[in-house]
Amino acid sequence: MPYQVTPTPLEGVLVLEPKVFGDARGYFFESFNARDFAQATGLERPFVQDNHSKSARGVLRGLHYQVQHPQGKLVRVTQGSVFDVAVDIRPQSTTYGQWFGLELKADNKKQLWIPEGLAHGFLVTSDTAEFLYKTTDYWMPEFERSLAWNDPTAGVDWPLAELAPLQPSLAAKDAAAKSWDQLRQEW
């Protein structure tokens, strides 16, 4: 099996570690194979869109989700490192209201599967980071929402000390993100 799969404390969120073949020349690994993904996770998902972002140290993207056409995401870092976060906003979930975060790095090649219906975001902890994600539905800006990265109900413990003296750099839509209480009526 080319993936080692580790469940996280959040229902349905999985850490995937691909099998890497390396020698003095470098390394090779399959970053995605639909058959192997389904076999390793028990999930069959039609990925329809790939996204690639490059961000500077301190950039915080998220916490994003779509109220209609929710997106499952398979995410990884190809350069640098990020602290990647999923927040369970599914009212019927056994882990509703909880969050999980881990460091994704180009060096560790870990990937995170975030099922449909969770809010997702990341904080760049290296000088720059390139972040790739596969999604199970298309981006639809009219349905996109942002949960405030520092919402006390979500309670995400971002590694801000690593950035000092920088503060998170946010896009306008993320700076204007709403609170848990403002958004939960749509869940």
What are these regions (language model features)?
Residues 1-107, 126-128, 135-187:
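Non-catalytic, conserved peripheral segments adjacent to functional cores
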